[in-house]
Every structure is written in structure tokens, then in C-alpha cells.
Amino acid sequence: MNARLTGLGLNLLSFAVGIGGWYLLTATGAVVLPGPVDVLERAVTLLLNGQLVGDIFASLRRVLSGFVLGVALAIPVGFLMGWYRIARSPIEPWVQFFRMIPPLAVIPLAIVTLGIDESPKIFVIFLASFLSSVVATYQGVISVDRTLINAARVLGAKDATIFARVIVPASVPFILVGVRIGLGSAWATVVAAELIAAQSGLGYRMQQAQLYYDLPTIFVSLVTIGILGLFMDRLLQAADRRLTQWQERA
């Protein structure tokens, strides 16, 4: 408990120092950017007129849709690649091929083929989340200590039992790392997608604000994305601690 309180205190201190440094830089004119007070005032205005809430829900809907679909497909595909060599050979090269292509580069193609509605945005988010999570899951399966597998076989365990009792638990830390990376990729991708083709969302709001050099609104969107991403990442960290209680931690 004391360690958690200390960590929380250091987190809050870090944020306070960061905001204080931001305030000093803008107040002294060292950088020509809006200060924390200006950004807070604009955030209140956007909250009261409903724009910020609408943009948050629009971006969250896209992120969660693509992210959940990507992870839901990545985990079984990753296990399939890692557990069955006959499946690994035809699938793994394609995964690595598409992993080398930035999801943002797919946005124009997705818009041309899927239209300008929600489909292309969700697709590129799905792709970014899938590629991050599938590689982590695959790596987790092939990294399982062979001694554990051989010991289970000596004790008479069948393949299904080994998979459920050895492979899956040992792979969970890798999977959760991939999921967290996929979450970051999902947020980066949704902002880029909204910058190009959207009528709502935090990325769309930044693009509109850029046209009028509205820096406070741009900062509101940036800070909101950071807060939402941090909150979702903390939820995944909590799930990680609960699912991997057996694992020794530094």
C-alpha cells in the first residue's frame, strides 16, 4: 500500500511539475503557445456547448470498435501461429509484411474502397491494433519455456491440457503488452483518420482549429486524447496485475 501511495504521489508531482513548467514557458514568452489557463478556459467552453463531449464519444466509439475487433482476432491468430508450425509458415510472412506498412498509409486506400463513412476509420484502427497484438501473442507462445511443456508431457498431459494450463498462462504477459501497444496505435490512427475524413471527433476538431490558427482548441484535443489514453492504459495495467499475480515483479 505504501509503495502504491508513493507511486501515486510521484505521478501527481510529475504532472504538477509539467504543468508548472508549461505555465512558466508560456507566461514568460519563451514559447508562443497557449498556457494552461487558456486551454482550461477553452475546454470549459467546449464542454458547455457540447462539442467536446460529442468529439470524445465519436473518437472513443471508433477506437473501441477497431481496437476490440483487432485484439479479438489477433489473440487466436497469434496462438495459432505459435502453437502450430503448419499454420505459422503461411501466416507469419503476411503478418510481418503488413506490419511494415504504416496503418496511416492505408487510410487513402481504405477511403477509396470503403467510402467516407465510419468503415475506413474503424478498419485502419483494427489493422493497427491487430498487427501489434498478434505479434506479441505469437512471441509469447514461442517463448514459453520448453522445460515446462516437456514436464507436462512427462506427467501425461494431453496437448489441450498443456495449451490451456501452460501455454496460455505463460503467454498472458506478452499478450497484455501487445494489447497496450495496440491501444496506443489505435489512438494515433484514429486521430490521423479523423484529420483526413471525418465530421466529428478529436482529430477532426484539431483539423478545423488548425484552419483558423486556434491553438487553445488544438491543445484541448491533444490533452483530452492523452487523458483518455492514459486512463485506458491504467485499466489494462490493472488487468495485467490481476491476471499475472503469479509473476514476480521488479
UniProtKB/Swiss-Prot annotation:
Pfam families: BPD_transp_1
Domain ABC transmembrane type-1: from-to ranges: 56-236
GO cellular component: plasma membrane
Keyword Transmembrane part of the UniProt annotation: yes
Membrane topology: Multi-pass membrane protein
Disulfide bonds: none
Transmembrane stretches, start-end: 12-32, 63-83, 94-114, 122-142, 172-192, 211-231
UniProtKB keywords: Cell inner membrane, Cell membrane, Membrane, Transmembrane, Transmembrane helix, Transport
Biological processes annotated in GO: transmembrane transport
Similarity annotation: Belongs to the binding-protein-dependent transport system permease family.
Task of the protein: Probably part of an ABC transporter complex. Probably responsible for the translocation of the substrate across the membrane.
Name under which the protein is recorded: Probable ABC transporter permease protein BRA1188/BS1330_II1179
